[in-house]
C-alpha cells in the first residue's frame, strides 16, 4: 500500500529536499497553500488538500485541513478493524506521516508595529490540530514539527521502510511540548492584552538556551532556559565576547550584578559581586576611577568575582582589571584596545556585552521562585524612590555630604541579602554585612569590614531596627548617619538612642528584604 504524507509548513527550510527524498521512496504527498506552491515549483508532485477533503480552502485559509478526511486518516488505529472499516466505508485514506510547523505567532508579536489583528490572524488552528491528532496516534503515525528531525526520519524510512516506535514516541512528545508552548505564548499575549494580573492558570514558555555541566553543586543536574519572548537586558540575551561557557552559579551571580547596576544610571559606576552579594560598588566621574573605588571597597572578596560596569570599558580601565582574577566582566561595550588587553593570556575570562539602554524594559517582568510543590510570583523590587519623600526622624539633619552618601548607601543595600547592612561613603562601599539571622550581627560584620575607613561613613539597613542595640553599635563605631525604612514598634527607642549620640537618622518608609 502506498504511504501518504501530509506536508504544510510555514518554515520552508529543507522541505523541498525532504519531500524529494520521500518521493524517491514511493510516498504520496498531500500539501496545502504556499507549501504546495513551493513543492510544485521544485518539481515535486503533490496532491492538493481540497482534492482530499472535497472542499476548497476558504475564509482566507482559515478552513482547509479541519475535515474528517484529514483527521480520520490521522487518528484511525491500524490495529482496530473497526477503525479501518470505518475509514474504508467513508472513503478516508490513511495518512502515515505529518510534517507541520505553525504560523509564526511569536515572530509576529515581536514586531514593533504589530497590530492586535495581525497577532490574531497568526494564531494557527489547523496546524496544531493535525499535529495533536498525529501525535496521539503515534503508534502508527510519524509526526515532525522541527526541520532538525527530517534527517533521522529519512534515515529510518530509507533503512526500514518505516520509523521505529521509539522515534515516533519521541517525536510525539516533542509535538506536545511544541503545541503547549505555542498555546502558552498565545495565552500570555491575550492575558497581557486584557490586563489580567492574577490569572487563575499560569502558563509560561521558555526555550532551552544551554545544557549545563551541573547546577549549584556538581551533584545537581541543571539547564538554562530563556524566555520565549527574550528580554534584551538579560544574561540570557547577553553577547559573549570571550571565555568559557557560563556556569549555573555564574548566571545567577551575573543576573544579580546587572540588577544592582540598574539603580546607578547617572554616573559611571562599577559593581563587584560574589555569591549574589555586592562586595564593592564604586561611583565616580569616570569609569576608571569608579573601578578603583569598587576594587578598594574589598580587594580580597573581589578575587574570583563578577564585575559589571555601566560605561564602555576603555584601555586604561582594562589594564587595571587585567591584573585581578575575575570570573566575568559585563559592560555595554568595550574598545578594541580594551578587549585586546582583557583577553591577553585570559582565554577563560568571560566577557559579556549588554544593551544598557534596555534596562528599563527589563524591570517590568515578574520574578518566579520555585518552592516544593509550588511557584511564587512577584514583581521586581524596582519601586521608584525620591529622597524628598524620606523623613529625618532625629534632631540632627544630615549634612550635604551625608545626604549624598545616604542616597548612595540606600541604593546599594537593596541588593544585600537580608538581614542586610552596608557601610559606605558618598562614592564607594566600605563594609557589607549580609545574610545574618539577627540584624546586630550584620551591623558588626559591616563595621568590622569598614574599620579604619569610618570617617564620614554612613550606614544603611534593608529593614527596620527591632531594638536600639543596633544604634548603640553604630554610634560606638563612630558612624554618624543612618538610613533605614523605619516601621518597628520600637522605632522611638532607636530615635532616642540616635539623638543621645548625636546621630542623624533617615526613614525611607520602604523595606528591601532580599532572600
From Swiss-Prot:
Residues 1-145 form the MGS-like domain. NCBIfam families: PRK00881.1, purH. It comes from the Bacteria. The gene is purH. The IMP cyclohydrolase activity resides in the N-terminal region. Pathway: Purine metabolism; IMP biosynthesis via de novo pathway; 5-formamido-1-(5-phospho-D-ribosyl)imidazole-4-carboxamide from 5-amino-1-(5-phospho-D-ribosyl)imidazole-4-carboxamide (10-formyl THF route): step 1/1; Purine metabolism; IMP biosynthesis via de novo pathway; IMP from 5-formamido-1-(5-phospho-D-ribosyl)imidazole-4-carboxamide: step 1/1. The lineage of its organism: Bacteria, Bacillati, Bacillota, Bacilli, Lactobacillales. Keywords: Hydrolase, Multifunctional enzyme, Purine biosynthesis, Transferase. Its EC number is 2.1.2.3, 3.5.4.10. SUPFAM superfamilies: Cytidine deaminase-like, Methylglyoxal synthase-like. This is Bifunctional purine biosynthesis protein PurH. Coiled coil: none annotated. Belongs to the PurH family. It holds the Pfam family MGS. It catalyses: (6R)-10-formyltetrahydrofolate + 5-amino-1-(5-phospho-beta-D-ribosyl)imidazole-4-carboxamide = 5-formamido-1-(5-phospho-D-ribosyl)imidazole-4-carboxamide + (6S)-5,6,7,8-tetrahydrofolate; IMP + H2O = 5-formamido-1-(5-phospho-D-ribosyl)imidazole-4-carboxamide. One of its GO terms (cellular component) is cytosol. One of its GO terms (molecular function) is IMP cyclohydrolase activity. GO terms for biological process: 'de novo' IMP biosynthetic process.
Amino acid at each position: 500500500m502506498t504511504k501518504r504524507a501530509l506536508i504544510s509548513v510555514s518554515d520552508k527550510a529543507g522541505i523541498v529536499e525532504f519531500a524529494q527524498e520521500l518521493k524517491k521512496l514511493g510516498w504520496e504527498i498531500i500539501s496545502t497553500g504556499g507549501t504546495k506552491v513551493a513543492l510544485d515549483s521544485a518539481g515535486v508532485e503533490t496532491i492538493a488538500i481540497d482534492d482530499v477533503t472535497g472542499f476548497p480552502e476558504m475564509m482566507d485559509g482559515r478552513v482547509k485541513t479541519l475535515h474528517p478526511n484529514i483527521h480520520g486518516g490521522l487518528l484511525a488505529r491500524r490495529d482496530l478493524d473497526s477503525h479501518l472499516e470505518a475509514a474504508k466505508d467513508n472513503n478516508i485514506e490513511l495518512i502515515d506521516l505529518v510534517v507541520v510547523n505553525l504560523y509564526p505567532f511569536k515572530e509576529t508579536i515581536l514586531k514593533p508595529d504589530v497590530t492586535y489583528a495581525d497577532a490574531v490572524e497568526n494564531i494557527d488552528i489547523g496546524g496544531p490540530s493535525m499535529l495533536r491528532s498525529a501525535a496521539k496516534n503515534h503508534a502508527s503515525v510519524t509526526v515532525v514539527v522541527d526541520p532538525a528531525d527530517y534527517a533521522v526520519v529519512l534515515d529510518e524510512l530509507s533503512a526500514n521502510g518505516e520509523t521505529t516506535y521509539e522515534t515516533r514516541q519521541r517525536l510525539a512528545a516533542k509535538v506536545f511540548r511544541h503545541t503547549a508552548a505555542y498555546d502558552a505564548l498565545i495565552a500570555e499575549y491575550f492575558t497581557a492584552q486584557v490586563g489580567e494580573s492574577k490569572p487563575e492558570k499560569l502558563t509560561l514558555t521558555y526555550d532551552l538556551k544551554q545544557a549545563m555541566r551541573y547546577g549549584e553543586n556538581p551533584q545537581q543536574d541543571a539547564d538554562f532556559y530563556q524566555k520565549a519572548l527574550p528580554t534584551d537586558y538579560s544574561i540570557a540575551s547577553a553577547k559573549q565576547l570571550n571565555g568559557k561557557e557560563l556556569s549555573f552559579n555564574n548566571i545567577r551571580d551575573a543576573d544579580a550584578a546587572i540588577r544592582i547596576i540598574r539603580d546607578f544610571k547617572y554616573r559611571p559606576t562599577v559593581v563587584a559581586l560574589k555569591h549574589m552579594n555586592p562586595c564593592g560598588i564604586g561611583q565616580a566621574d569616570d569609569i576608571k576611577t569608579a573601578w578603583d573605588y569598587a576594587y578598594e571597597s574589598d580587594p580580597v572578596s573581589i578575587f574570583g568575582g563578577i564585575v559589571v560596569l555601566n560605561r564602555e570599558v576603555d584601555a586604561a580601565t582594562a589594564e587595571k582589571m587585567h591584573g585581578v582574577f575575575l570570573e566575568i566582566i559585563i559592560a555595554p561595550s568595550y574598545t578594541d584596545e580594551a578587549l585586546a588587553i582583557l583577553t591577553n593570556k585570559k582565554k577563560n575570562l568571560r566577557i559579556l556585552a549588554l544593551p544598557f539602554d534596555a534596562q528599563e524594559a527589563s524591570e517590568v517582568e515578574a520574578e518566579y521562585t520555585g518552592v516544593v510543590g509550588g511557584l511564587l510570583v512577584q514583581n521586581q523590587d524596582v519601586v521608584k524612590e525620591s529622597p524628598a519623600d524620606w523623613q529625618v526622624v532625629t534632631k540632627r539633619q544630615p549634612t550635604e555630604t551625608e545626604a549624598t552618601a545616604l542616597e548612595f548607601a540606600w541604593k546599594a543595600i537593596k541588593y544585600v541579602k537580608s538581614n542586610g547592612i552596608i557601610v559606605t561613603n558618598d562614592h564607594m562601599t566600605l563594609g557589607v554585612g549580609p545574610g545574618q539571622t539577627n540584624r546586630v550581627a550584620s551591623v558588626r560584620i559591616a563595621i568590622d569590614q569598614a574599620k579604619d575607613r569610618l570617617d564620614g561613613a554612613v550606614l544603611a539597613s534593608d529593614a527596620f531596627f527591632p531594638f536600639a542595640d543596633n544604634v548603640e553599635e553604630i554610634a560606638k563605631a563612630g558612624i554618624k548617619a543612618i538610613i533605614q525604612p523605619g516601621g518597628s514598634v520600637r522605632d522611638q527607642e532607636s530615635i532616642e538612642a540616635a539623638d543621645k549620640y548625636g546621630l542623624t537618622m533617615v526613614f525611607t518608609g520602604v523595606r528591601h528584604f532580599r532572600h
